Amino acid sequence: MAKIKPQALLQQSKKKKGPSRISITNIVIYTLAVLLLVFVLFSAYRRWTHRSEIPTHNGRSVLEDAAFPGMKNVDLPRFATLDTGKGSVTIELFKDTAPNVVDQFMKFCQDGYFKGFLFSRVVKHFVIQAGDSAEFDAVKDWALDRKNIDTSLKHEEFMVGTPKAKNEQGGFEFFIVSAQIKDLNEKLTVFGRVSKGQDVVQEIEEVETDDQYQPKSPIEIMSVTLLQDM
């Protein structure tokens, strides 16, 4: 057996005891991996906290289309429940007949736009207006012409619509019409009807108003919840 020289033994000993070097490339890779892991965990946390803020009904999310990209029509909300100071009013949304307006309405719901909204004008046994606009000729016309309404026309009651004229402020207002109004479709784009809470609408109509049909005591929409079914 050949003898190993002392000098060779010393070199082998140094190789065994010396610390291994970590290349800069490895350091960069490890750092990127850690940052990626932190980003994934943070994104998951943000998504979880966001979902926890979404209202639910019967264990399902009820996010209030354009607001819902990628969802099938069968999965989209079909009802909106207004929680008001007088009680709850549920509106069936006419997605098939007024898709653009319904999409806009749902987007405003999702953004919380209607929270704190006031019923700004009320005409007893006729119409209530949610939102404020300087242009309310339709309300004045209907109020002044109540006695001349042609009740033989079969317009459904408790329809919900928004003015056809563009809102210059970029907002959204809507009317709940509790009477048969002959020029309803000329004034408004109808996008729904009250399917539950007609008594609440009638109670709102009973409030005392001034000569501009504005309620003397504010009636507020506290929240709007969108549902797939009732």
From Swiss-Prot:
GO cellular component, one term: Golgi apparatus
EC number: 5.2.1.8
A Pfam family of this chain: Pro_isomerase
Keywords from the named record: Chaperone, Isomerase, Mitochondrion, Rotamase, Transit peptide
Organs and tissues of expression: Ubiquitous, mostly in aerial organs.
Record's note on what induces expression: Repressed by the munition hexahydro-1,3,5-trinitro-1,3,5-triazine, also known as Royal Demolition eXplosive (RDX).
The keyword Mitochondrion is assigned to this record: yes
Ranges of residues in domain PPIase cyclophilin-type: 76-226
Reactions catalysed according to its record: [protein]-peptidylproline (omega=180) = [protein]-peptidylproline (omega=0)
MF annotations from Gene Ontology: peptidyl-prolyl cis-trans isomerase activity
UniProt family annotation: Belongs to the cyclophilin-type PPIase family.
Its job: PPIases accelerate the folding of proteins. It catalyzes the cis-trans isomerization of proline imidic peptide bonds in oligopeptides.
Protein name: Peptidyl-prolyl cis-trans isomerase CYP21-3, mitochondrial
Gene encoding the protein: CYP21-3
